[in-house]
Amino acid sequence: MDQDDAAEERFRSLHAASYTDLLRFVKRRIPDDDADDVVSATYLIAWQRFRELPDDVRPWLFGIARNLLANQARKRLRRSAVDVRMVATAEADRSPGIDARVDLVRAWWAVSAADREVLALVAFDELTDVQAAAVLGCRPATFRMRLNRARKRLRAAMGPTLPTAVESWSRT
């Protein structure tokens, strides 16, 4: 096996290990129809910069995808760089907890796009503080401060019905 074959095999392994998480990350931010294009462009950049990839490639890939999403947003003249899509589905029978979920969705959209992104990186994408900081291009201490402030603002927007799950978001 020559160097090119080894590099191709390593890239295939990287793709297999990260594709689902990366696609999920992108789909939470843009319509599903556009997500595959962003993910493909992310892997194209990863292939072009393959020799420069960091050891912990997952946050690096998320950062590349985030930059591509921001570029798309600027092209479309959107106000925010990235919107996290969150769809509330209320059941007709008003099952237990539905009111709290609806309140959470309202509170989610009441906080800024920057706060939603910080919260989503730890709650939905399950990144550590260090990984999320790498995605945003800031120091881990700065990210932790942003996360703490975002959680406080979400808590304030939610009021007394804040679900306990939100309280546990990234206590790492």
Show the residue positions of the predicted features.
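Acidic, proline/glycine-rich intrinsically disordered inter-domain spacer in sigma factors
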Residues: D2, A6-E9, R76-R79, V84-W109
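C-terminal edge and immediately downstream basic/flexible tail or linker adjoining helix-turn-helix-like DNA-binding
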Residues: D2, R10, K152-T172
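Short, charged helix-capping/linker segments at alpha-helix termini
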Residues: D2-S13, L23-A41, R49-D55
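Helix-turn-helix DNA-binding module
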Residues: Q3, W109, A113, D125-T142, ...
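Arg/Lys-rich amphipathic alpha helix in sigma70-family domain 2
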Residues: E52, F62-V84, P96-A100, R149
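DNA-recognition helix of helix-turn-helix
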Residues: R66, A70, L136-P160, T164
